Amino acid sequence: MKTKGKVVGVNGNLVTIEVEGSVSMNEVLFIKTAGRNLKAEIIRVRGNEVDAQVFELTKGISVGDVVEFTDKLLTVELGPGLLTQVYDGLQNPLPELAIQCGFFLERGVYLRPLNKDKKWNFKKTAKVGDSVIAGDFLGFVIEGTVHHQIMIPFYKRDSYKIVEIVNDGNYSIDEQIAVIEDDSGMKHSITMSFHWPVKIPITNYKERLIPSEPMLTQTRIIDTFFPVAKGGTFCIPGPFGAGKTVLQQVTSRNADVDIVIIAACGERAGEVVETLKEFPELIDPKTGKSLMDRTCIICNTSSMPVAAREASVYTAITIGEYYRQMGLDILLLADSTSRWAQAMREMSGRLEEIPGEEAFPAYLESVIASFYERAGIVVLNNGDIGSVTVGGSVSPAGGNFEEPVTQATLKVVGAFHGLTRERSDARKFPAISPLESWSKYKGVIDSKKAEYARSFLVKGNEINQMMKVVGEEGISSEDFLIYLKSELLDSCYLQQNSFDSVDAAVSSERQNYMFDIVYNILKTNFEFSDKLQARDFMNELRQNLLDMNLSSFKDYKFNKLEQALSELVNLKKVI
C-alpha cells in the first residue's frame, strides 16, 4: 500500500508534508490539487514531516491537500529514441507536450519520454545459453547514426543465463525481446527500455581510465593551448554576452564525438529557442545529415520552475552515461551551471540552512564535484572503451572569476577556458583569454612549442601595458617586435571565423601545419630600419596568414600564399 500524506505548509516551491507511513530521501511524490497531480521530490525528512521541492508552480496548493508517495526515486527512461528528442528536466518530450497543451505548458502534465508505438529493427548478438550480467549486450538497433545496444538493465545485480531471445525483426520498446534466468531459477523479462535513478551514477564497467586522448574540437585556441581530453571535464566561465553559448554550439557541431547532449539549465529562453531552431538545420560534417540525428537536448529555461533545473542537469548526465555503456564517446554541455547553483541557493534559503559565501549553500562544492566526477573514460565489461566529456559554462556576475560557483568548478575540472569582456568587446572570437586559461590535458601540438608561443603572448601583453603609459617611443625596437609577433599570433592563430566554411573547423593536421608556420615566424630574428617599417611588414605577414586561414588546405591558392609568405620572411630575416 502506498504511503499517503497531507500538505501542512507551502513556502514558494518548497512544500512541507505530514506523512502517514515510511518514506525515503529523494523519493518522488505527487501533490493532488485542483484536479492535477504535481510532481515533487523529497529533499529533507524530519520525524513525521518531510520537505519536498515541487517541479511545477505551486499556485493553488493549500494546507490539507492529499499527497501520494511513489516509493521510487526520480528516474529517466533509457532506450532507443532518446536521440533527436527535446526534453524538459523531467524528461517530458516538449514537442509532444506542445501538441497536447499548446505553446503554454500546463501544470501536472507528464508524458512518456519514449515512443511506445515505433518499431525498431532489432538484430541479436547474444544467443540462448549465454551467461550475462548488467550492462551486457543482447543485440542492437540503428538509431540515427549510432548502433544503439540493447543491454541487460543496470539494476540487475546477479549473473544470469539467457533462456529465450527473439529472432531479428521489428519490435517496439515494450515488447519482450529476451528472458533471463538467475541462479535461483527465477525468470526475468527484458524489453528494450528500462528506468534508472538520475542521481545514482551508472557504474557497470570494468575500470576507469585517466583521460589522455585529446577530444578534437577543431577550435585552434582550445586544441593547441587549452586542450580537452575524452572523458575529461572543462568549464567556460565568462560575463554575459562574451560568447559562451556560441562557443558551446560551435564545439557541439565540430567535436570529435559520437553523441552530443545539451543541458540548457536556466539559460535565457531566446538562446534555447535559437538552439532548437538552428540544430535541425545544421549539417553534421561527419555524416552529411542533420546534427539533431546525434543530439539530445534537455532544456529548462530561466522562465521554468527552478527545481527542474537541477533535474535537467542530472537527467542529461544519466543519458550520457547510458550511451557511454555502449562504447560511444559523449559530449555533455551544461549551459549554465550558475543557474543550477542559483536554484540550489534558493532551495537552501527556504530550508533555512546556514548559508555559505554569497548565500550559496555550504555543500555547493561537493554537489558540483559530484556532477563533474560522473564524467570519465571507462573500459566496459567486453573491453570496449566509452567516454563522457563534460563541459559546463559558468555565468559569474560581472565576469568576476572569484565568485563561489566559478571557484568550486575550478577545483574539479581539468581545463579552464575563461572568456573575458575585454576580448569579446574587441570582437575576438573565441574570447578565451590566453593569459588566464589553463589545461591539464595533452593537446595536438607539442607542449614545449605551445609554451614557447604562449610566452610571446605574456610578454606582448606586458609590453602593451607599458606602451599605454609611455607610448611606442618609450620602448626598445626589440620589445616592439615581440609585441607585434604576439599580435600576429593572436589574430592569425587564436582567433577564428565561425561563419567561414573553411575557418570554422580546423583539422589537427592543418593546426599542426599552420602552427609550425607561425612558430617559425616567432623564432625568426628580423631586422628593420624603424618601428614603422616593422609594423608594415608584420601587418603584411598577418594579412597573408589570414588569407591562408580562409583558403582550403593545400589547394592552389593556399600554396601560392604560403610561397609568398616564405619569400616575405626571407626578405627581412637576419641570417
UniProtKB/Swiss-Prot annotation:
Q: Which Gene3D superfamilies match?
A: 2.40.30.20, 2.40.50.100, Bovine Mitochondrial F1-atpase, Atp Synthase Beta Chain, Chain D, domain 3, P-loop containing nucleotide triphosphate hydrolases
Tell me, what is an example of a GO biological process annotation in this record?
Answer: proton motive force-driven plasma membrane ATP synthesis
Q: Mind listing the UniProt keywords for this protein, alphabetically?
A: ATP synthesis, ATP-binding, Hydrogen ion transport, Ion transport, Nucleotide-binding, Translocase, Transport
Coiled-coil regions in this chain?
A: none
- Residues binding ATP are G238, P239, F240, G241, A242, G243, K244, T245
Pfam families on file: ATP-synt_ab, ATP-synt_ab_N, ATP-synt_ab_Xtn, ATP-synt_VA_C
EC number(s) recorded for this UniProt protein: 7.1.2.2
**Catalysis performed (reactions):** ATP + H2O + 4 H(+)(in) = ADP + phosphate + 5 H(+)(out)
Q: By its UniProt entry, which InterPro entries does this protein fall under?
A: ATP-synt_VA_C (IPR055190), ATP-synth_a_Xtn (IPR031686), ATP_synth_asu-like_sf (IPR023366), ATPase_F1/V1/A1_a/bsu_N (IPR004100), ATPase_F1/V1/A1_a/bsu_N_sf (IPR036121), ATPase_F1/V1/A1_a/bsu_nucl-bd (IPR000194), ATPase_F1/V1_b/a_C (IPR024034), P-loop_NTPase (IPR027417)
What cellular component terms from Gene Ontology apply here?
proton-transporting ATP synthase complex
- Domain of life of the organism encoding this protein: Bacteria
Q: Is Cell membrane a UniProt keyword of this protein?
A: no
What's an example of a GO molecular-function annotation for this chain? proton-transporting ATP synthase activity, rotational mechanism
Q: Which HAMAP family does this chain map to?
A: ATP_synth_A_arch
**Function summary:** Produces ATP from ADP in the presence of a proton gradient across the membrane. The V-type alpha chain is a catalytic subunit.
Give the family, as the similarity comment puts it: Belongs to the ATPase alpha/beta chains family.
Name the record gives this protein: V-type ATP synthase alpha chain
